[in-house]
């Protein structure tokens, strides 16, 4: 049994890790909304909007780096992240011409920011389920704060509203060590120790073993993803569903996808129900988009993604349970979820940029 103090301490740490894991998406969101203007800076706009799928891919690539090397990168990464954010802050306040310096700064800092989701998820999904919800709450809250800052035009008025970004970096990086030292986390790590390996080693799931244990879950996630991508294409061409959403949807796709949703009951049943709801809602939008009006159409279109997120959350939770004896189970979860993020954000970029409704 663990004390209440240990649970509260770990809950606070993983909440801060959720704030930290949101930073690459917030970085992309801020640049895409503040510095993107297709008329005056076309190539910069493409760089910033492609930042979302790039961040997802880089987060996946960081999972291929051995854990000991990833941990060693923490100190230089946080120093460069804060330095880059300070330079961006200074450019916003004191410089009137950022058409070259800002894209270079954006591209230099993004790969290092993508380290944080890997380190955070590697810790969080070894902890009990209640602490995983605190992590997801932190990530969702961070994305919501910056989305509201853009909606209210606070970021356009003053660069001071970038300050939460610095707070997220400071709190999150400081919480990494605290979470690792917590006995709840270390006991979860101990349960993944292999009895057939030398002292200090843990069981690791290979690609073959992952495919053997979770074939239907991966197939169902792929089928759901293909279904929703087809829905996006059809509704974009026929119903102009992205009108007014292109500024905010990429952050929603990244944030909500990484946060998951509610999953109750059997994963396959939840996935089937959510796929059915996605299909029915898309049919309603397709045939009644003129009757629904802009607000009704937007609400129903967003609800399609909420259903999808809930279905994938149920399937990914089932995958984590099947891989609970392996220390890299959380990284498998990250790869699957962030590849789904990549597919959606890249598809949204292609549709909005090249396929006019």
Swiss-Prot record:
Q: Which example biological process does GO assign this protein?
A: virion attachment to host cell
Location relative to the cell: Virion membrane; Host cell membrane
The stretches that face the Virion surface side, renumbered to this chain, are 1-11, 33-46, 68-70, 92-98, 122-133, 155-158, 180-217, 239-240, 262-267, 289-298, 320-335, 357
Its GO CC terms? host cell plasma membrane; membrane; virion membrane
Q: Which UniProt keywords apply?
A: Early protein, Glycoprotein, Host cell membrane, Host membrane, Host-virus interaction, Membrane, Transmembrane, Viral attachment to host cell, Virion, Virus entry into host cell
User: Where is the chain membrane-spanning?
Assistant: 12-32, 47-67, 71-91, 99-121, 134-154, 159-179, 218-238, 241-261, 268-288, 299-319, 336-356
Q: Which domain of life is it from?
A: Viruses
Q: Which Pfam family is an annotated match for this chain, by its short name?
A: Herpes_BMRF2
Specify whether Cytoplasm is a keyword of the entry: no
Q: List where the motif Integrin binding site lies.
A: 199-201
The record, for InterPro entries, names: Herpes_BMRF2
Tell me the function of this protein. Facilitates virus attachment to oral epithelial cells by binding to host beta1 integrin family. Participates in rearrangement of cellular actin to increase intercellular contacts by binding BDLF2 and thereby promote virus cell-to-cell spreading.
Q: How does it assemble?
A: Interacts with BDLF2. Interacts with host beta1 integrin family.
Query: What name does this protein carry?
Result: Protein BMRF2
Tell me which species this is from. Epstein-Barr virus (strain B95-8) (HHV-4)
